[in-house]
């Protein structure tokens, strides 16, 4: 589903575009009216996807609030759509948790963990499903298998033995996508997010076919700041390759960003280069010598938050190096002390990373590639038609640019170790998706991954599979590998280790 330009994606993009237009164009006098008009602009005279225009507009209204960085309205009392808007109309507005929220009016209350016999059942003589059920929940009704839901324990044995694959396992897509089991049910049977478990990776959001889960955005605040002429510098994550069209070159992408009003553009891969060298040094001095049994990378915030939440004894094993986003932002602020910094990337959880008190002074805005597309649309900018800008002087290495794909972080550190510490044996592990990350952390906890550098990526495929991406994984992976292979130099200089950014 993620490879397709679904109506869910189209609606989200329309919302982002409308919000960005208000930030760019609306006056203080017209802003409230313009915001209130968005649900009517999105849903005109007929409902396309739900039973009435009123429900569709109600859902669109909640999307508008989240896109402006506001929380959903309570269901038990009347709150105006624009309540809180004036307080959010400032450049310094940060996200207020929770970041990920279920829109109740959009949720279809999908059935969860249910086995059901489909019309594919042939009513065969063998009846393996009936024989294998440990609770006698299956009987023959009108010549077909039937599952008594009151007796079923959801073990799945019937499905496993059916020769016709006639038994369906119904799961909530959002629940199936969540690697930390944070999706639960409310009293209405609708999905709800246990915020104590959630690590804000956004996989539930991109897996819901009803678009019932959404995150908050700073697109309104950013577009308003750009309109005001604030000096804003963009730091772009290396996963930007292929996100705005297969034929869009890095130079055209930079040109499109300049047209939006960004005064300069830096690659986040620069910060990755710094981290790569520092992590290699840390591994050589601490892990290879046995002072630390293993070292966990920290560039993926959902991965590091999960490690802290679910494996608190491992906190000291999480790398303390600056993440690429923060390291790059500090380079920018060092060179442009009066500028604001926006991180543009594929990641939803970077929004929470930027909320940390230790990061707030470094990163002023975080938007995803999906939200950036809304900014481009609001300004009628098409990256593929923009002029080619030459590569900036602060170009990153192949190692840093490769951070965007699963295994790229560990691979870059491994290559630095082999180059700069050739006598040290290197043990590398990497995991992608939170479910796999939990498995590898369990192995580390059991002492089965000693003297090891462990890379974790919450999103399947790494950053290029993030919740805020526009393009499918397969084509992006191919394009990114081509870009990395053509990048020079291959490795960062050891001198970066001495760069003072703290």
Residues of each region from the PLM?
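Iron-sulfur cluster-binding cysteine motifs and their immediate structural context
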Residues: 126-149, 157-194, 199, 203-218, ...
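N-terminal [4Fe-4S]-dependent radical SAM core
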Residues: 89-118, 135
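Glycine-rich adenosyl-nucleotide cofactor-binding module
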Residues: 110-131, 160
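Iron-sulfur-associated redox domains of electron-transfer enzymes in respiratory
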Residues: 1-75, 215-502
């Amino acid at each position: 589903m993620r490879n397709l330009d679904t109506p869910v994606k189209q609606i989200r993009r329309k919302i982002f575009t409308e919000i960005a237009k208000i930030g760019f164009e609306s006056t203080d006098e017209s802003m409230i009216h313009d915001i209130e008009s968005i649900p009517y602009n999105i849903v005109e005279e007929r409902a396309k996807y739900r039973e009435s225009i009123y429900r569709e507009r109600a859902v669109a209204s909640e999307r508008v609030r989240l896109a402006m960085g506001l929380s959903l309205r309570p269901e038990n009392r009347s709150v105006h759509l624009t309540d809180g808007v004036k307080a959010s109309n400032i450049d310094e507005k940060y996200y207020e948790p929770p970041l990920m929220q279920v829109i109740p009016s959009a949720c279809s209350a999908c059935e969860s963990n249910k086995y059901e016999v489909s019309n594919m059942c042939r009513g065969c003589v063998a009846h393996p499903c009936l024989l294998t059920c440990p609770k006698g929940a299956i009987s023959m009704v009108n010549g077909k298998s039937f599952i008594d839901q009151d007796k079923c324990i959801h073990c799945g044995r019937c499905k496993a033995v059916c020769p016709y694959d006639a038994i369906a396992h119904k799961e909530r897509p959002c629940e199936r996508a969540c690697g930390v089991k944070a999706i639960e049910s409310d009293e209405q049977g609708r999905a709800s997010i246990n915020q104590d478990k959630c690590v804000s990776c956004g996989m539930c959001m991109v897996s819901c076919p009803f678009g019932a889960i959404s995150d908050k955005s700073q697109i309104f605040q950013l577009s308003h700041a750009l309109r005001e002429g604030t000096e804003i510098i963009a730091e772009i994550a290396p996963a930007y390759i292929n996100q705005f069209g297969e034929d869009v070159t890095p130079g055209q992408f930079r040109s499109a960003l300049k047209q939006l009003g960004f005064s300069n553009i830096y690659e986040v891969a620069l910060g990755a280069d710094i981290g790569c060298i520092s992590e290699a040094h840390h591994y050589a001095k601490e892990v290879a010598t046995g002072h630390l049994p293993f070292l966990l990378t920290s560039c993926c915030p959902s991965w590091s938050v999960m490690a802290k939440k679910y494996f608190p004894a491992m906190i000291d094993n999480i790398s303390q190096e600056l993440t690429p986003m923060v390291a790059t932002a500090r380079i920018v602020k060092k060179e442009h002390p009066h500028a604001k910094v926006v991180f543009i990337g594929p990641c939803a959880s970077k929004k929470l990373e930027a909320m940390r008190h230790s990061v707030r002074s470094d990163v002023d805005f975080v938007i995803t590639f999906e939200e950036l597309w809304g900014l481009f649309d609001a300004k009628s900018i098409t990256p593929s038609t923009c002029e080619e800008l030459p590569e900036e002087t602060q170009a990153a290495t192949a190692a840093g640019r490769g951070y965007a794909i699963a295994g790229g972080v560990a691979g870059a550190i491994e290559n630095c170790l082999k180059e700069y510490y050739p006598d040290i044996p290197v043990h590398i592990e990497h995991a992608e998706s939170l479910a796999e990350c939990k498995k590898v952390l369990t192995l580390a906890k059991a002492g089965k991954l000693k003297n090891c550098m462990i890379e974790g990526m919450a999103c399947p495929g790494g950053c290029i599979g993030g919740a805020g991406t526009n393009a499918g994984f397969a084509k992006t992976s191919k394009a990114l590998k081509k870009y990395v292979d053509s990048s020079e130099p291959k490795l960062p200089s050891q001198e970066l280790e001495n760069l003072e950014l703290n």
